[in-house]
Design a protein with these regions (language model features):
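Core catalytic region of metal-dependent phosphoesterases/phosphodiesterases
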Residues: 1-59
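Conserved beta-sheet core of the metallophosphoesterase superfamily
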Residues: 47-63, 71-170
Length: 170
């Protein structure tokens, strides 16, 4: 039920953030999905409140459908990916964030809509659909959209772009 998944998700987020902040400051970027739009906002609000006095954690929980993050020469766009056509994402990035686009040389978009790994490159910009750690809900099961539960953590160099990732299979 939604209450169990809500509680489980924010507790998983707190556990993960607490671990990561022992290594480096943590920036949390909350992206709503097409099936959990309101719940993801609530989770983001809980996380923001939980860490309100913690200088090692920042939370971006605004309602923008696409969010951008700069790390050195890297430009990252985060979106659920159900509204945009993948091949249009590079132009969307350049249009919405022209200064960041011009100042960076490594650019990627991370999307989650398909709940499975899928990577395409358009004009030198990778559009990456990432797998989900969440179990399939009844709607996904009814539709036959089964996918392996997998989490991925990306390793970025400020100067050289993405250098690899770690994968965790649930």
């Amino acid at each position: 039920d939604w209450k169990k998944s809500f509680r489980g998700y924010w507790k998983l987020m707190v556990y993960t953030i607490d671990y990561l902040k022992t290594i480096a400051p943590v920036d949390v970027i909350v992206i709503s999905g097409n099936h959990d739009y309101e719940r993801m906002y609530y989770v983001g609000d809980v996380i923001d409140g939980w860490y309100r006095n913690d200088d090692a954690v920042t939370v971006d929980n605004n309602n923008e459908p696409r969010k951008y993050y700069r790390y050195g020469t890297n430009m990252l766009m985060f979106t659920h990916g159900d509204k945009e056509k993948a091949q249009n994402i590079p132009l969307i990035m350049a249009t919405e964030q022209p200064e960041m686009f011009a100042a960076t040389s490594h650019r990627e978009a991370h999307c989650g809509h398909f709940h499975k790994e899928q990577v395409n490159e358009y004009r030198g910009i990778k559009v990456r659909f990432i797998p989900s750690i969440c179990p399939n809900d009844s709607w996904h099961k009814q539709m036959g959209y089964e996918s392996k539960r997998t989490g991925q953590a990306y390793i970025w160099s400020k100067a050289r772009g993405m250098e690899g990732y770690n994968q965790y299979n649930v």
